[in-house]
């Protein structure tokens, strides 16, 4: 998903609003995970806007499906951001040579874009693994039992339910070691600027809206709706809530 979305964003990078959209794709690193999880429940939960789609296929958000959706939503916008950056980092000379040789479509993707994407895949996979490995809220909310667990949840259970501090410390130590190993792998791989768009000059001309790109626009729209619908759902439910002002000025909220 990240590769396809990044490719489409890069292909239509001259459309107004694409740059702010790309910059906003880092939102999953800023927002608390619980907000995304609550947004997913608002969309796909038992009383969610799109729950009827899951019912058609006899699917339930509470289980492995919810865990997968949550982690896809938490990771694919950021992955898209990284891949888009790698495409922007391709030198002007490479784009110029490709255009001179008449490359386009799949040939251009295979010759220029794919090598740029391929070299950062190990870095992206390492980053996603670390984020999923340390996941807590999505697994404990959608998993709801011992069938789905992570080290984070095992530590939580050891402290809260078993009162076994030795076990919790041992699990935490194992988690630190594993994270350090993958962090070292990440640091020794290609350095990527996650939050700054490249200023490299990319060959191309500004494109106008065209009927031949309808399929691209539809895919972009689907990706955007999928990525941002949980946030929109949270905002809408918050605005419509009659208790919003009461909670906002409550003593517990002000203390927090």
Roles of regions detected by a PLM:
Residues 42, 137-163:
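Glycine-rich helix-loop "coupling/hinge" segments at transmembrane-helix boundaries
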Residues 106, 243-247:
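Juxtamembrane membrane-water interface segments that cap and precede transmembrane helices
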Residues 1-88, 116-143, 168-187, 211-239, ...:
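Membrane-water interface segments at the C-terminal ends of transmembrane alpha-helices
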Residues 90-117:
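Short helix-to-coil transition segments within interhelical loops
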Residues 98, 167-168:
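Solenoid-repeat scaffolds in large eukaryotic assemblies
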């Amino acid at each position: 998903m990240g590769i396809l979305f990044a490719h489409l964003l890069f292909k239509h990078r001259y459309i107004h609003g694409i740059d702010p959209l790309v910059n906003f794709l880092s939102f999953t690193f800023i927002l608390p995970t619980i907000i995304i999880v609550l947004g997913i429940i608002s969309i796909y939960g038992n009383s969610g806007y799109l729950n009827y789609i899951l019912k058609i296929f006899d699917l339930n958000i509470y289980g492995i499906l919810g865990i997968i959706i949550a982690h896809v939503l938490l990771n694919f916008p950021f992955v898209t951001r990284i891949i888009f950056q790698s495409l922007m980092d391709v030198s002007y000379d490479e784009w110029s040579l490709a255009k001179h040789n008449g490359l386009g479509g799949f040939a251009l993707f295979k010759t220029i874009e794919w090598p740029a994407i391929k070299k950062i895949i190990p870095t992206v996979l390492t980053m996603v693994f670390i984020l999923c490995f340390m996941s807590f809220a999505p697994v404990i909310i959608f998993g709801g039992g011992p069938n789905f667990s992570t080290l984070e949840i095992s530590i939580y259970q050891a402290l809260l339910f078993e009162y076994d501090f030795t076990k919790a410390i041992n699990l935490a130590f194992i988690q630190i070691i594993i994270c350090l190993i993958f962090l070292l792998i990440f640091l020794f791989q290609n350095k990527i600027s996650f939050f700054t768009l490249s200023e490299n000059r990319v060959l191309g001309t500004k494109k106008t809206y065209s009927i031949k790109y309808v399929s691209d626009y539809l895919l972009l729209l689907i990706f955007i709706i999928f990525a941002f619908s949980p946030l929109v759902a949270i905002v809408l439910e918050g605005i419509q809530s009659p208790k919003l002002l009461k909670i906002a000025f409550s003593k517990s909220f002000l203390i927090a």
